[in-house]
């Protein structure tokens, strides 16, 4: 079965699950009733998803979480994960095991030389109500280790930046980095997850590689080739492996090929975890059209699992459409940056 055939088959199973009155959730069953057509009959290939409108993330804020629970899961308790939001009611996604599937697949692709089995992990970043906290701990456990945590509240940082309280931002960053330094120095940390900004701040205090950190798994809104080169060659001194990822609560995790970064002039391409999620790069003005390879466009995400169906969601990011590769034989997204980054100032805070 080709990747496209596998994707179509997976999609049909997911559509059947979410729009079957016995297994689907109230939200999608009510949506189909109001839309006046049956996705189980009319969606047979991935191209047919264009019959759906773009998923609106405000639905995740305005709807009660229970309306997204598939009837096929019965009364099984669910996790609640938040995404984005600085003020007001946050947007939330419910879940059960998707984060485990995503991060086990990611963990299977980590290099044991740089991310040792049974190694100690440190997560230095947003925990709290985010999926990432459980995901990183599960990743550490899955690979035989345990995980320490240093929490960070990005919502608070964004508020401080918006109020131009930059001294407070610096004090808060120091508070977070101080904790990370102590953990790395005294707990034998070998594997680290953090954001690019925090990684850079850590390196201003200690030599991360000489303190024993062998691998760094990093996530952030945007990482230019210049930033990637700086982090790999200066911050990590060319010694610890740098593994950039692109992910969020709604998608899971899109992986890169860390061993190819130098050969590609530090430009990062990410591939989604198909068939569970698909990333497309669509035209900025006509989102029904996919851009040509090597052109910039807006990132469109479709998530398709039994836990969560989200068609054609327009991310607040733009990227270059990249060609498939041997390991991931489907389109990738490269040089991700905030949507409209060239036209307006975007607050990324500590990412």
PLM-predicted stretches and their roles:
Residues 28-31, 35, 100, 138, ...:
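Flexible domain-boundary/linker segments
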Residues 1-82, 88-120, 125-129, 142, ...:
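Nucleotide 5′-phosphate-binding alpha/beta core
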Residues 1-17, 143-351:
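Active-site glycine/GP-rich loop and adjacent strand/helix microenvironment
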Residues 133-147:
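Conserved short alpha-helical elements in the N-terminal third of ANL/AMP-binding
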Residues 24, 36, 85-88, 133, ...:
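Glycine-centered flexibility sites
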């Amino acid at each position: 079965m080709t990747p496209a055939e596998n994707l179509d088959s997976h999609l049909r199973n997911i559509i059947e699950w979410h729009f079957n009155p016995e297994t689907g959730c109230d939200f999608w069953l009510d949506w189909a009733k109001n839309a006046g057509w049956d996705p189980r009959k009319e969606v047979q290939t991935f191209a047919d998803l264009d019959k759906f409108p773009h998923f609106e993330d405000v639905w995740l804020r305005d709807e009660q979480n229970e309306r997204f629970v598939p009837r096929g899961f019965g009364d099984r308790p669910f996790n609640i994960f938040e995404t984005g939001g600085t003020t007001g009611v946050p947007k939330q996604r419910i879940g059960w095991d998707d984060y485990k599937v995503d991060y086990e697949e990611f963990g299977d692709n980590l290099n044991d030389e740089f991310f040792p089995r049974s190694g100690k992990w440190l997560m230095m970043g947003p925990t709290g109500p985010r999926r990432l906290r459980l995901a990183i701990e599960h990743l550490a456990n899955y690979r035989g280790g345990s995980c320490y945590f240093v929490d960070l509240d990005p919502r608070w940082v964004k508020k401080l930046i918006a109020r131009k309280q930059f001294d407070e931002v610096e004090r808060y960053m120091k508070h977070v980095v101080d904790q990370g330094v102590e953990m790395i120095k005294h707990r034998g940390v070998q594997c680290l997850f953090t954001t690019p900004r925090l990684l850079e701040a850590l390196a201003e205090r200690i030599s991360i590689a000489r303190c024993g950190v062998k691998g760094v798994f990093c996530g952030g809104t945007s990482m230019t080739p210049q930033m990637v080169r700086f982090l790999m060659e200066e911050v990590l001194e060319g010694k610890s492996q740098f593994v950039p990822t692109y992910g969020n609560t709604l998608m899971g995790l899109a992986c890169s090929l860390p061993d190819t970064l130098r050969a590609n002039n530090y430009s990062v391409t990410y591939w989604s975890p198909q068939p569970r999620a698909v990333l497309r790069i669509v035209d900025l003005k006509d989102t029904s059209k996919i851009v040509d390879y090597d052109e910039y466009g807006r990132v469109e995400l479709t998530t398709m699992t039994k836990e969560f169906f989200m068609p054609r969601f327009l991310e607040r990011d733009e990227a270059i459409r990249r060609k498939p590769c041997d390991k991931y034989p489907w389109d990738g997204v490269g040089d991700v940056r905030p949507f409209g980054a060239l036209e307006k100032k975007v607050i990324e805070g500590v990412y």
